[in-house]
């Protein structure tokens, strides 16, 4: 499946979708440091094929990708749904931009992530109005045996006629069973990004904001494995 990765960060979510067999064909990421990491990872051969990286989702046109992209993924920012924002939309609310891209691309499925239940509920409501069925799950890194929490809500959306496609995924994700026993062999707090740049603050910010690949892949697998899909 061809993936359009929104809010791609430094590539944690993209590594998860690589585990699931996706092929990233385009990414969107505003942070310059994360874009540098994504470019370096492509040069390192971490991804199946090279892909373009757009900077600002607010200027990204998804229409040329209709018919090419099968799945849109993204951990959209949660600032607009924080307690400080009192759940009100602000200039930081970028879910409407992700929703716009989904409408333009019309993907076969959508996989989204957020730390806020309110944000995920809003996304689910909007996607259901667009004709998708949705499933959500709460899963943290600690649930897979890590010594840090990183609690996240994960949302999978798909049209009724794609149920067969998702069942096929179920047969491909058995390798994720037992992943928690092997993925935490090193302390994530000591992670290093070997990209030749010494931007420690930016590196830690990217790690802190990013998705844990094993958690993202497992969340997708669990959502697909639900009996009513």
Where do the language-model regions lie?
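Conserved active-site and SAM-binding loop architecture
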Residues: 1-229
């Amino acid at each position: 499946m061809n993936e359009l990765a929104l809010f791609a960060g430094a590539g944690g979510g993209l590594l998860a979708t690589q585990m699931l067999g996706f092929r990233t064909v385009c990414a969107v990421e505003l942070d310059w440091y994360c874009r540098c990491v994504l470019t370096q990872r492509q040069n390192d051969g971490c991804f199946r094929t090279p892909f373009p990286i757009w900077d600002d989702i607010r200027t990204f046109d998804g229409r040329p990708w209709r018919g090419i992209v099968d799945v849109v993924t993204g951990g959209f920012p949660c600032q607009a749904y924080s307690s400080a924002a009192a759940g009100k939309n602000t200039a930081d609310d970028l879910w409407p931009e992700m929703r716009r891209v989904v409408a333009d691309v019309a993907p076969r499925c959508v996989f989204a992530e957020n730390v806020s239940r309110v944000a995920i509920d809003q996304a689910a409501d909007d996607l259901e109005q667009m004709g998708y069925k949705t499933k959500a799950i709460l899963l943290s890194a600690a649930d897979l045996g890590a010594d840090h929490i990183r609690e996240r809500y994960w949302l999978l959306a798909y049209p009724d006629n794609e149920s067969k496609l998702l069942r096929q995924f179920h047969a491909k994700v058995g390798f994720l069973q037992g992943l928690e026993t092997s993925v935490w062999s090193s302390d994530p707090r000591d992670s290093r990004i070997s990209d030749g740049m010494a931007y420690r603050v930016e590196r830690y910010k990217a790690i802190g904001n990013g998705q844990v690949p094993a958690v993202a892949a497992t969340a997708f697998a669990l959502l697909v494995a639900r009996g009513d899909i």
